[in-house]
């Protein structure tokens, strides 16, 4: 324990480490503020003027509007919202045109527009997948079989995307059949808020890798651990202590940073909107049976696992290489490889088996949850979020073991 405390103290005494930790905490606040600042809406006044609201004022105004549409997403409520929408369009013209009265839009369209979000999808063309125009949908077609209609659309999508893999199609339909219906809606929080959670996790991963790179390689360069390595517990025990100290620092930093980040978001957008079903924020045919509050927890857990798996890879490289710069460069390449692989080739094994597969931009864990990517091998199909988590879990232990093994076998030049 004393050796552990000394190692932790040694890490924290580094000016570079302290600077990176401060940056991590500052980014937590700054990146939570950004999606809040993006919020905006025009509020019509009684005298005919318009007030532009931004930030917290816009969020508060929207919350008051959305209260009327909060509740279970039943076919009757969707039908009523569609009838109101179509009535307004027939009377005032398309909602997107400038001539549409702002007061009517705020009063009759905004409160219920998220109820209609999945309607175009549910009635999409089965061949092309193009969503139906809301004006072309007969309200009488929205009956008790609305959720069956959604399942039919998922079947069409999976048939188009996984045409040669019936196992993937069947697994997606089985997973969708397990969803709790009717869905629940309490609008408020934006997609940007969740995107910035993932972006913050990416920056945290970069900062943690930058700190971890010198764990062993830095000592090789300076010879700082030469004497300790000759003692009874100077190899395996020292390696384990260094790794535990590094992991402790990264776990605490991650949890503090992400907690501050999410608390700021939830304080701004409110917690009622976290009861909203995942399908009502992204796609009506999404597979996860979770709400937005559970989504936050899942993103944090998956993010922490991916960060630790990536750091364990960096620690292995640090134990293997002789200088910090080489470790840092290779680690950054490993960290960003899934992102580049996904952009170049889409969802493949290469983009999902790296320790950092759940971290990034288009390839991040959030987007994998919202997508329908299945990887196929033989007659089996695997949903990419499951592959990402399993790979990261295995690699965390494998790279940690290899780091210890490499450090024990290291020979001082």
Q: Where in the sequence are the language-model features?
A:
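Cytoplasmic juxtamembrane regions at transmembrane-helix boundaries
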Residues: 222, 230, 314-335, 408-413
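Residue-level recognition of transmembrane alpha-helices
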Residues: 21-24, 242, 331
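Short helix-to-coil transition segments within interhelical loops
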Residues: 229-235
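Alpha-helical transmembrane segments of multi-pass membrane transporters/translocases
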Residues: 17, 306-314, 371-413
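Secretory targeting signals
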Residues: 26-89, 138-219, 240-320, 364, ...
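Transmembrane helix segments
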Residues: 33-34, 324-357
């Amino acid at each position: 324990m004393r050796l552990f405390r000394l190692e932790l103290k040694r890490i924290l005494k580094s000016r570079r480490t302290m600077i990176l930790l401060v940056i991590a905490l500052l980014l937590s606040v700054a990146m939570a503020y950004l999606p809040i600042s993006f919020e905006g809406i025009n509020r019509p006044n009684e005298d005919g003027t318009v007030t532009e609201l931004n930030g917290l004022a816009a969020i508060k105004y929207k919350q008051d509007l959305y209260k009327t549409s909060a509740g279970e997403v039943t076919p009757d409520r969707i039908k009523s919202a569609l009838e109101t929408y179509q009535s307004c369009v027939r009377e005032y013209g398309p909602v997107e045109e400038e001539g549409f009265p702002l007061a009517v839009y705020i009063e009759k369209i905004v409160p219920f527009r998220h109820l209609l979000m999945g309607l175009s999808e549910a009635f999409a063309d089965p061949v092309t997948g193009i969503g139906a125009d809301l004006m072309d949908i007969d309200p009488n077609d929205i009956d008790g079989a609305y959720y069956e209609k959604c399942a039919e659309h998922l079947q069409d999508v999976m048939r188009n995307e996984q045409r040669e893999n019936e196992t993937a199609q069947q697994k997606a339909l089985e997973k969708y059949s397990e969803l709790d219906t009717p869905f629940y809606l309490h609008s408020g929080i934006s997609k940007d808020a969740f995107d910035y959670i993932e972006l913050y996790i990416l920056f945290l991963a970069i900062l943690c890798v930058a700190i971890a790179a010198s764990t062993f390689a830095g000592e090789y360069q300076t010879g700082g651990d030469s004497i300790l390595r000759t003692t009874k517990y100077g190899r395996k025990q020292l390696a384990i202590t260094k790794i535990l100290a590094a992991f402790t620092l990264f776990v605490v930093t991650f949890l503090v940073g992400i907690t501050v980040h999410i608390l700021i978001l939830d304080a701004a957008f409110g917690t009622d909107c976290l009861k909203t079903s995942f399908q009502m924020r992204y796609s009506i045919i999404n597979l996860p049976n979770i709400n937005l509050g559970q989504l936050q927890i899942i993103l944090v857990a998956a993010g922490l696992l991916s960060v630790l798996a990536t750091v364990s890879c960096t620690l292995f490289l640090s134990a293997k290489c002789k200088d910090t710069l080489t470790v840092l460069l290779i680690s950054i390449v490993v960290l960003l490889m899934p992102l580049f692989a996904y952009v170049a080739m889409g969802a493949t094994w290469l983009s999902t088996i790296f320790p950092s597969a759940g971290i990034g931009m288009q390839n991040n864990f959030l987007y994998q949850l919202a997508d329908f990517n299945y990887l196929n091998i033989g007659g089996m199909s695997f949903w990419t979020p499951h592959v990402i988590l399993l790979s990261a879990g295995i690699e965390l232990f494998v790279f940690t073991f290899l780091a210890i093994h490499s450090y024990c076998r290291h020979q001082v030049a």
